[in-house]
Amino acid sequence: DNWLKTIQDSIQTKYPNALKQNIIKRNMMLLKDKPFASYYEQIEKAINRNDIVSINHRISAFMASYFDIIFAVNELLHPGEKRLDKYAKDNCQILPNKFEENINKLLVQPNSETLNILDDMVESLRQILYLGYHI
């Protein structure tokens, strides 16, 4: 029908330059350029206090902004949250130097024990819930 063609046509329009500039400016500020409380600064503070939950939370936010910038630079619509590195490699003509290497170094934590650890965490929660405690 017409509604599908309308959606397809709207997607085929040129990437708005103002949107591109705003995405880049806002997310660069969040990454490190903000005078205080940038993701970089928050990660640094979390590292100094050895707060691994906060480190991972802030790294996730950092990565979201990082990919927002990459897709804006390449004038691509954001594909969602899964396999962003592969999507970027396959579809972006402009990528940061050491793109894969830096991501792999940053996110090296997941390993063969990750699923076992998650299973243990869930089972521990179940034990608490089974005993009638509330989280």
Functional labels for PLM-detected ranges:
Residues 75-104:
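Short, charged amphipathic alpha-helical segments flanked by flexible coils
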Residues 48, 67-78, 82, 130:
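Charged/polar positions within long, soluble alpha-helices
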Residues 58-65, 86-87:
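Small-residue-rich helix-loop
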Residues 1-47:
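Conserved NTP/Mg2+-binding pocket subregion across the NTase superfamily
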Residues 27-32, 58-59, 117, 121:
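Amphipathic alpha-helix face/heptad-repeat signature
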Residues 101-135:
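Long, charge-rich low-complexity segments
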